[in-house]
Amino acid sequence: MRLVAVLCLAASAAVCARAQVDAELTAKRRLFPEIGPGLKTVKRGVDGKIYVLASPTPGLVVFSSEGKRLLAIREMGGLTAEARKEAADSGEVLVGFGEDFDVDSEGNLYVADRAGNAVQIFSGTGKHLRTIPVNAPLSVATLPEGEVAVTTLGGPELVSVYDKNGREVREFGDPDTLSDRQDLNRFLNIGELASDALGHLYYAFEYFPEPTVRQYDRFGYAGQDIVYRELDALGEAQAVRREIAKQESRKDAPRFKRVLTALGVERGTGEVWMAMGDTLLHFDKEGNRRATYLLYTPEGARVMADTLVVEKDKLIVGGDPIGIYEFERPSDK
């Protein structure tokens, strides 16, 4: 093992977490080399297709399992004024700015359109099906029976759930208290969603001092918290807490660097993987850390993860602007 610097808070560069690394993972290959800047999310559908969101361009792109481009759902910000007019005249529904998306078992696409203050729903062929008005959506995850879970920039609860008709049916998840300043505390509770095939929902707190993923059932009952509290992460957590205290007395908008940068859940087992920049942590379904890895491209550059797909035999990791890479899944031995 070797000690490697993994993540520094921009505002507190003097303090840096150091993690014990079990192995270095080098990507087998780069996927979709035309995609890099603006990359938001990568998903694998049950149909084997790979879905990629990069905003504002090229938008949400669907690839076959062999890598052939099948479909693109465009965004306003990636088009000229003339192209936007042509789209409007033709009846094409454009996404304003996609922050995240998910795909359900039927291939329908749910896009968190932050600029449009909505979740836009498209069929697998790109036909627009429905708009759900949601103020500043940040992350989405599909649930059984056509439901979709949504996180927002400032809702009173962490998660809102909408049914197949676009009606809000429940909210859940009280924000944890990290600051007495209300807007700052809500910002620090911003999170990313994922779901598994077992009916669980996962909420990754992106700005918590200690990287944390909370498990819920689909009805909002909280299960376990998976928290990275190893000694090597103590310095980073202390730096984040100092920055919280520093910004608490200010009146301007919160400004923090994400601590937990990507969440991946193996759909069949519910095992959680979380990324902190170029460092990848694997936890078993009981929340025990199994291993820690560093991520590299075939050329030796670090892969700073913004999105993560976990499969039985491989990992797909993507970052803005470095692009999307396929890794052989390690055995954790």
Could you describe each region identified by the protein language model?
Residues 4-12:
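Bacterial N-terminal signal peptides
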Residues 19-333:
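Eukaryotic scaffold repeat domains enriched in small/polar residues
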